[in-house]
């Protein structure tokens, strides 16, 4: 698909590709796990594929034929997933991923040399702002931009676990994966909103009122 997107971009210049962070690091072996719950928690569309496909996705990000990395975050609980016991088609479709998108991408992208820090910023922020015609108000550090910023610590480390995540769901598809590179602070319109994982600020800014 990434090859087709690349060719279409050359012709129409209006075709965009977006892999999910889950597909960059997880593969179809997740569905063969002996624990039914483990497999069902990872049911999503498109489903995970053979691990060999991941090289093509990374190459698409490197070449620019794939523009941004998303999650399709759907926080279905294990109990909700169990609606599909006995009928696969009734398993709610989707997984979590929003909280871990950037640390996993930094670790597996920048940490392995697949992406540069600038490419990381592009596929997590700048490119989507441009696609949605929100640039340079969003996706840029410029005078007049909204100052929605993440202060990143490339040396900070953690092991991903459902027991310590912010999400209220009872599992994490990246459980046990070690990541190096974490957000320290998040600013919304120039005001510190999150620090070291703690939410500080929820009031709307004057522009939002």
What are these regions (language model features)?
Residues 1-11, 201-209:
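Single conserved hydrophobic/aromatic residue that forms the stacking wall/gate
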Residues 7, 23-27, 76-79, 130, ...:
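Flexible loop/turn segments at secondary-structure boundaries
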Residues 7-8, 12-69, 86:
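Histidine/acidic residue-rich metal-binding segments in metalloenzymes
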Residues 18, 72, 105, 190:
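Residue-level signal for inorganic ion chemistry
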Residues 35-42, 63, 67-69, 75-156:
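His/Asp/Glu-enriched, well-ordered alpha-helical/loop segment
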Residues 42-52, 91-96, 173-177:
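A short acidic, glycine-rich active-site loop
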Residues 56, 136-139, 182:
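A structural connector/turn signal
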Residues 83-87, 143-198:
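C-terminal cap of metal-dependent C-N hydrolases
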């Amino acid at each position: 698909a990434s090859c087709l997107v690349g060719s279409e971009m050359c012709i129409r210049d209006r075709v965009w590709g977006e892999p999910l962070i889950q597909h960059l690091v997880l593969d179809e072996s997740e569905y063969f796990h002996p624990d039914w719950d483990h497999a069902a928690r990872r049911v999503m569309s498109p489903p995970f594929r053979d691990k060999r496909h991941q090289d093509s996705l990374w190459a698409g990000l490197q070449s620019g034929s794939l523009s941004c990395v998303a999650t399709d975050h759907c926080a279905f609980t294990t109990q909700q997933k169990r609606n599909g016991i006995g009928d696969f088609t009734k398993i709610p479709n989707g997984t979590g991923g929003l909280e871990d998108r950037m640390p996993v991408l930094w670790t597996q992208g920048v940490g392995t040399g697949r992406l540069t820090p600038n490419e990381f910023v592009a596929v997590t922020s700048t490119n989507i702002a441009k696609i949605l015609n929100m640039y340079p108000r969003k996706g840029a550090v410029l005078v007049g931009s909204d100052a929605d910023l993440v202060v990143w610590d490339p040396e900070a480390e953690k092991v991903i676990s459902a027991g310590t995540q912010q999400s209220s769901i009872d599992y994490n598809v990246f459980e046990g994966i070690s990541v190096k590179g974490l957000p320290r602070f998040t600013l919304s319109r120039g005001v510190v909103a999150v620090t070291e994982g703690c939410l500080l600020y929820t009031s709307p800014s004057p522009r939002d009122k």
